[in-house]
């Protein structure tokens, strides 16, 4: 495996399952030091053990992206452990789907806080280290839901907000050698989409089948499809690509 990230440190939020875990694993396989923060202790411990068993340098910490003190401490510890924070992937996410008239204040606030406040806290903490090094890569995970999706007014708003956040940061901190981009997944087979199937009362296979019927490449997405896109933006060779949103959805989106 090519060690294109050797000597680099990738800090991934929500990195113990699904898309996040695929991102962490691919960074590790390609030579990066990896740092994971997550709220799922069981998954975090399992992922950390798997990576260490393979000899990969890894930092794992139970922390909430909505707690700026926890994030600041994690960043400090990662910098002390590995000597830099070069890549930030804002992957942590949550859904609380419901129609507007049924959506509670907590449903709204939880989703907005995890995605937007979380990305704000992590990016603000990371840029302190990146600007000193005159190098950095920040990649935010948006979604095709940013374009609007029934029953997801909170999630759609958060994911659209991340796109605006991405473009603004690209303008603000580009002069410090930092690029900021976003990846917007379409239908990806994860625990989150399994939960969606359960919520609407259909089998996961049926949910996949319905999604695939509308995807031009005639297949569903896998976490590796997203990690491939993330690593493209994280690569040193992508230094002239910033402020972009890449839809990884198996076809054009409207």
Please provide the spans of the model-predicted regions.
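Short C-terminal tail/terminal secondary-structure segment
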Residues: 231, 242-254
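Conserved glycine-rich cofactor-binding loop
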Residues: 16-17
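Substrate-binding pocket helix/loop in short-chain dehydrogenase/reductase
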Residues: 99-100, 107-112, 138, 207, ...
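Alpha-helical segment proximal to the catalytic Tyr-Lys
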Residues: 128, 171-175, 239
């Amino acid at each position: 495996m090519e060690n294109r990230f050797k000597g680099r440190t990738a800090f991934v939020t929500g990195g113990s399952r699904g898309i996040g875990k695929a991102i962490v694993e691919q960074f590790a396989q390609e030579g990066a030091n990896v740092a994971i923060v997550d709220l799922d202790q069981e998954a975090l411990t399992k992922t950390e053990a798997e990576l260490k068993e393979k000899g990969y340098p890894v930092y794992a910490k139970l922390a909430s992206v909505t707690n700026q003190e926890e994030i600041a401490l994690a960043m400090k510890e990662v910098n002390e452990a590995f000597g830099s924070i070069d890549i930030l992937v804002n992957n942590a996410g949550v859904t609380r789907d419901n129609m507007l008239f049924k959506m509670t204040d907590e449903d709204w606030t939880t989703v907005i806080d995890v995605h937007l406040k979380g990305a704000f806290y992590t990016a603000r903490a990371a840029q302190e280290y990146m600007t000193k090094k005159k190098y950095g890569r920040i990649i935010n995970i948006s979604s095709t839901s940013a374009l609007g999706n029934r029953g997801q007014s909170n999630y759609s708003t958060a994911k659209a907000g991340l796109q605006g956040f991405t473009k603004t940061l690209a303008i603000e901190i580009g002069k410090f050698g930092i690029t900021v981009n976003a990846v917007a997944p379409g239908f990806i087979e994860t625990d989150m989409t399994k939960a969606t199937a359960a919520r609407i009362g259909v089998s996961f296979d049926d949910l996949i089948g319905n999604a695939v019927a509308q995807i031009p490449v005639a297949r569903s997405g896998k976490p590796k499809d997203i990690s491939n896109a993330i690593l493209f933006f994280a690569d040193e060779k992508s230094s002239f690509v910033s402020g972009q949103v890449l839809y990884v959805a198996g076809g054009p989106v409207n």
